[in-house]
Amino acid sequence: MLNGLSIRSLPVIFGRPEAPVTDGGRIVLPAGEFAQIANGEEARFIAYLEFLVGEGRSRGNHVHARRAEALYVVRGRLRARWADVASGEREEQVLKGGDLVHVAPGLAHAYEALEYTQAIEFSATPFDPLDVTPYRF
């Protein structure tokens, strides 16, 4: 795995948990699902993302020099690509609903829907358009 990249599938608990969920998890109850994506992390940027299937609909394709980001896939599947711009090392994986990805500064990233997908992106750093450099995969 690339340095500065972490991918984790949040654990799923069916019914009320015996102990509090403090490190992320999905609790499925008759009334619906509760997903604790982060606990104790500061978020100064939060965005909802919808990914539609189709040629040329890849999102991202850029790198940030200063900003770390997290992406939580609510539902669907994405082909994710990352590249360490300093070393040239690359990685590709398929993300699915319940996956949580942390991307460090200096890692280019791109996401393409394999099926209709919804996700939430968050960061401790506000969005700065001057910290977005296009990257061609």
Regions found by a protein language model. Name each.
Residues 1-45:
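A short, N-terminal "cap"/entry segment at the start of jelly-roll beta-barrel domains
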Residues 77-79, 100, 118:
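Structural motif
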Residues 52-56, 97-98, 104-106, 116:
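Tight coil/turn sites that cap or link beta-strands
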Residues 51, 65-84, 122:
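Short, conserved beta-strand element in jelly-roll/cupin
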Residues 110-137:
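Double-stranded beta-helix
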Residues 85-105:
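Short acidic-glycine-tyrosine-enriched beta hairpin
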Residues 68-73, 93, 101, 110-111:
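His/acidic/aromatic-lined binding-pocket segments of jelly-roll/cupin-type domains
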Residues 47-67:
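Conserved short histidine dyad/triad with adjacent acidic residue
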